[in-house]
């Protein structure tokens, strides 16, 4: 889908660049596949702010997207493509031969009327799901499981994908968008193709108000705060902080390694950080 620009009648319109969603379904989602979603405003169960600069935003209904695709060897027809406010990718409503409906992530080049199926050995076409070990090397995949039967976790946002670049006994080697290469078990399943809406990265919000509609509040820098509020705060006039960048709680930021999960290091063949050096 193409990008839309607008006549500069206001400063917000001048900057605005949006994805043209005219080809998507314009009605309401399937009620049985949606549920209510209450905004937390960045608070946890004790009422304390755990994520700063969150709150407000437009009311949204959560669409239950099927990341597992557990119905094997039952063909389904794509009924329509829909916008989903909860994610950057588009979603597709599919209807199985037994009449059951489900939402799935829509891959690129999926169209209304297409047939998709999940199974151990299926055609290599966008939207079909099969174990990674049964796919040919070089296949582009998305919504990839990291644990067998858990449901897709990798490559789910707009325009993303992973590529199978090799095999190692029971595992396949996946190259992710970040440049990381990691081992994933061959019995883990993935959907073929790249995720829809690749132009999302080229959009421009246009104005602060649209960011508020998304539930994001203004983000203030530490150097403009008082010393009581942030380690970078205080000083007469504009200062640069005077110390290495830290979080509001004094922990080093901007490049400080925070990964503590050592148990899965053995699955990472090429780190996404090493690639950038």
UniProtKB/Swiss-Prot annotation:
GO MF term list: rRNA binding; structural constituent of ribosome; transferase activity
Example GO BP: cytoplasmic translation
Region described as Disordered: 199-277
Keyword Iron applies: no
Record InterPro entries: NA-bd_OB-fold, Rib_uL2_dom2, Ribosomal_uL2, Ribosomal_uL2_bac/org-type, Ribosomal_uL2_C, Ribosomal_uL2_CS, Ribosomal_uL2_dom3, Ribosomal_uL2_RNA-bd_dom
Bias (Basic residues) ranges: 209-220
Keywords per UniProt: Ribonucleoprotein, Ribosomal protein, RNA-binding, rRNA-binding
Pfam families tied to this protein: Ribosomal_L2, Ribosomal_L2_C
Cellular component annotations (GO), alphabetically ordered: large ribosomal subunit
Assembly mode: Part of the 50S ribosomal subunit. Forms a bridge to the 30S subunit in the 70S ribosome.
Family: Belongs to the universal ribosomal protein uL2 family.
Entry function: One of the primary rRNA binding proteins. Required for association of the 30S and 50S subunits to form the 70S ribosome, for tRNA binding and peptide bond formation. It has been suggested to have peptidyltransferase activity; this is somewhat controversial. Makes several contacts with the 16S rRNA in the 70S ribosome.
UniProt xrefs under HAMAP family: Ribosomal_uL2_B (MF_01320_B)
Name used for this protein in its record: Large ribosomal subunit protein uL2
Species of provenance: Nitrobacter winogradskyi (strain ATCC 25391 / DSM 10237 / CIP 104748 / NCIMB 11846 / Nb-255)
